[in-house]
Amino acid sequence: MAKKSCEKHKNFNYYCEECQSLNQVSEARFNYSLLKKTRRYKKFLLLIAIIVVVVILLAVFWLWPSWFGNINLQSQLYDSKAGGLDYFDFFFLNFWSTNFLFNKTALIGAFIGSIIMSLPPERNLLTLIGTKLRFGKPSYWKSLIVWWTFGFILFYFLGLLLNANSGGFAWTLYLIENGEIQLSPNLIFDAFNVIFNANNTDYVTVYIYSNLIVPIVSFVFGIIIFRLILNIVKNVYLRRNDYLVIGNILVIIGLLCGLGFVFLPTLSLDGINVIQILGLIFGFFSFISLGVLIYLFGKAQYKKDIKNYIFSRSKQKKIIYVVVITVVFVISPLIISIGPLLNLNNSAVWTEQQWLKKYSREIEWTRACAGLDMFEERPIGNFTESSTTSDALMVSQIRQFDQNFAVQYLAASIGSTFEGLADSDIIYIDNKEYWVAPKTVRFSEITGDAVQTNTELYDHVEGFLAMDTFTGNLVNVTQEFNISENYPIFFGESESQRYLEQTLGYYEEGSLGAYDSDIILGTEWALGIPNNEFRYEGEPDGTLYGLEGFWKTLNIGLFAYAFQTEHQYLIHRNVRSRVENILLPQLRIDNDPYLVFNMNLGKMYYAVSVYTYINVGAYAQYPILRFLGVSLVDVLSGEMTFYKNPTLETSNDPTLPLWEIYLDKYTWQDTNLPANEWLKDQLRYPEDLFELQLEANYIYHVQNSVSWRRADDFHERPEDGDLFYIESDLGDGIEYVGLDLVEYKGLTATLLAGMYVIRHGDHFGEAIFYYTRDSGESLVGPTTARETYRSEATQDISLISGARHGNTLLYPLGGSIYYYVPTYSTAGSLQQLKLAGLVEAFNREVGYGENAQEAYNDLNLTGTVVPSNISLSYNFEMESTMTFPNDPAHFIIELQNLDNNFSAPGLQVKVNLSIYTSTVITNNLNLTYDLILPPYLYPKNFTYVDVPNTVTNFTVVDTPLYFGEGLVLNGFVNTTIGGIIIFYKWTLIVNGAIFYTSPENLISVY
């Protein structure tokens, strides 16, 4: 039967109250008893009950124990092996964190959404659904119930978006709750004051505003806009009304302008932007006001005449005129800003509008946040002028072998198929630099078998490898580090990317590697590898019982052990994840952990650096970067101990309130204590952190408006640039530093802009930038230096099979600065150092030879020659290597009196050979030297101390030479120990005066 309709509608409309009233009496006749559908409802209710029971059972017996078991394990791990850290507090953040489904952050979103949709109850969405399902338009009370039930759940999950800013919302509330920062009633006004007050550096206020106020306002505006969109759909689809549609659209535009205005304190604005932001204010009030007026006008028109809901042509024109006028008013600040914008090429306007109001503030904020006050600037000349190290000693400290060489060489020394190499690192210990690579499990050989990956079968490797960076030889780790050669590593790293690329030919980023899988303890698989001598004897990271242990064991593929009543595990065996999983928000680890050695105790640890990464916004172009310290992970037991950065400054840091909580939540040990001196000497500034600070300083070291405008002092890394750890002399003798070379940004000439150096040891954390901008001569960059070397040694390089150039490094030599460029042969299974070049940075003078010493000799930087009319030719040669004790270093002396005057008196010629090394090595190792000469020669010798060295001086030749007379003498130098580097120089004395002094040279004793 057709339903009746009112006068306004041709057919019955479900949402017209008049249509429904006409059919209420008629519909009563067709009502029938619901008892006919009882059976259907019973089946439906029974199905729902079954589903509910199944869901509850799954939650109780699977979802909860499976999920909470991992949480429980981590809580036990960090409580017992990280100094009692509260993992629940760190993970849940007192239920602010969205890591847990039920949290207070989502609850805030649920209440905000339900309140906004209930004032008054929003019925349009339900009406749209009702149109489709034909249940009609709901009442106000029904709508209210829906929004506080289903709507509450909907907005609860949408409320998780409040924490979408990298967890900043939850973390800010946690900081406020813990009393670390204060929530001021003037917060919004203080945040906007940052824009208009050039002297305002309130980092804390901007941080709170951007992480707390902005998400809430954005969420509120988003829900209001959603509600307005529903109104638009209603007035287009259900009951057309053009006035209400355009009114809602204008209000949405106004809200978007307001939302843009809310974000302003988080942006870096110049003077022109400050003028332009008035457009957002005008737009917010103008469009909302106009939208509301049109909305109310449309309502009034509809009440007068129900057919008056479509724009007539005349009304369309009026609306367009009003909107155009409004738009012109809104963009008027943009029009006004055109004047200053066109005059930015005027230096006064640029200084006023951009330098003072934006760039100088960016520099101030960024330097404070990124910690750029750590950089001291010195002219490049200071690098050579302050060096006190002899050339011979400096040459012996050159890092001849790069990481690529070290990985391949060390990998060839692995003695089993299941072992691989973790990342190789430069380690500085006892004033000596080494390439050190811990062994690791070769995961590609065992992956896919749960017994191999998740039991004690392959739970560790034993030992590590080390190589001398100068000689390229393997070292005895027991002798050099006081660590046994088969020291077990139960907690370590995965195979390094470089190792996998060299051995397998590929690297899959994100794939599981060694130590990434959890293992169960107490199985019969321990000591299943014949070569392994150790099994894990430490405490488990955690123990699970019942269903938690059952599902955890089942999830790692060990069904046979799932039904045990007690399960003990080692988890987070990869040292990176072990430390990373206990970090509070906005902390990061350095991605390059390295080994440190307590030689007194014979213990080995991984050092994992921890630093802050706190985004502030506004004029700070880089986050707050502070090195907090390291977590030492015992490779035997997995115990973690936190050691504080020995030079961390907290007294005058304006950003301290945002990261002081990290100092309180972790149990930091004092690195400056005498008992921890061993660690301080080996501590390394985090590479990732320093590179972030370098990247910031490349730009924000410029604090002069003229240089900034010219952009002639910005820096960038050269091709193949990196942070290289080397030994150098900055004025306090040989020390361990990180070196980063930079060129001027954008210049095709690739000139050296300077070098950044990060210091360690007693000067830990001090950074120096040696600049070239005031140098009278231009210094070539590393790219040009390599090209110069290649050009000079083209013929020799062409003879090297698969020639590869290694890292280009910079050293102070011969009173100047020289680039060191090694060339390796890559043919065959192993690389070999075939050629080495030294390139002077000022005049591009090149010396090259088989190694760094030969390259230095080729430069012919001779010693002192006293002008004389004496006709004497001389030549001194010495081998640069020897093997103790059976292959001493051979030397040859050639002398000839070239005087043609037969009546001239003879020359009294004396040749001294001075051999020396440091007094510490000489005394500790009881080192002495021997000369092997013809039996009729008995060279005189004496030993003396010339700080910091102990020198033994041999008089090898002491004889008269008459006209036409000469001599050739062959001999050998030997020592009483091997594995050291000794230095020597020749002194030729004629008639009691020094005639020639050779450069200092070295002999590598193997």
How should each PLM-predicted stretch be described?
Residues Y944-D946, V956-T959, E965-I977:
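Short, hydrophobic beta-strand segments
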Residues Q24-S871:
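Soluble extracytoplasmic regions of secretory-pathway and membrane proteins
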Residues V866-F884, L898, P948-F954:
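Short, compositionally biased P/S/T/A/G/V-rich stretches that sit at domain boundaries
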Residues E894-N900, N923:
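Asparagine-centered strand-capping/turn motif at beta-strand->loop junctions
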Residues K10-Y14, N23:
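Cys/His-rich microdomains that often coordinate metals
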